[in-house]
């Protein structure tokens, strides 16, 4: 019986991966900035910058890039991408005012994780952009019934900054593995040059 499902399952995984790669994802370019400087608009722009960097840091990764790590004690690019996925969940759950919980992602392909990460960042950015009181968003953990809460400041120096840091690691690692970041990407302007 198992043999009957093996080939369709492999094809389904391949089709899902192909569809995810052809899907129009956010952050090919940074969205237009807000007209007014507010705390919410600034946080939104930080997340948009993260989304743009993540999009291009992970665009065009090869199998050999995903398994690359510069030393035995370092994370592979795939492990780093997975960590950014978890950080994006923290940002997203905070935007939704939910306790931090993680999506089980062991069965997801890299392209699925990438797609979901970008969509979570975009949704979070949209929520924060239109917020007048950023202080209402707390980082909330519920571990085995024990609740702990942190102010939004920790979101800035925690998950947002950490994810930016790790995007830089992916760019560095992929350069070392022989597949450099697209040189036409202009992170200052948030565009890709022709």
Listing of model-derived features with the role each one plays in the protein:
Residues 106:
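A short, structured active-site edge motif that brings together acidic residues
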Residues 60, 83-86, 119:
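Residues within well-ordered alpha-helical secondary structure of globular protein domains
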């Amino acid at each position: 019986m198992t043999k009957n499902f093996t080939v369709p399952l492999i094809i389904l995984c391949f089709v899902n991966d192909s569809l995810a790669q052809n899907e129009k994802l956010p952050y090919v370019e940074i969205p237009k900035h807000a007209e007014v400087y507010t705390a919410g608009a600034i946080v939104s722009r930080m997340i948009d910058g993260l989304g743009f960097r993540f999009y291009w840091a992970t665009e065009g990764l090869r199998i050999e890039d995903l398994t690359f790590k510069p030393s035995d004690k370092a994370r592979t690019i795939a492990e780093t991408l997975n960590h950014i996925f978890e950080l994006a969940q923290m940002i997203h759950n905070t935007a939704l005012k939910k306790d931090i919980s993680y999506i089980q992602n062991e069965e997801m392909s890299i392209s699925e994780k990438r797609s979901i990460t970008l969509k979570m960042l975009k949704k979070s950015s949209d929520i924060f952009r239109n917020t007048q009181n950023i202080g209402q968003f707390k980082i909330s953990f519920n571990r085995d019934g024990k609740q702990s809460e942190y102010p939004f400041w920790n979101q800035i120096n925690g998950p947002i900054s950490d994810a930016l840091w790790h995007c830089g690691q992916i760019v560095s690692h992929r350069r070392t593995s022989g597949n450099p970041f697209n040189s036409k990407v202009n992170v200052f302007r948030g565009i890709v040059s022709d």
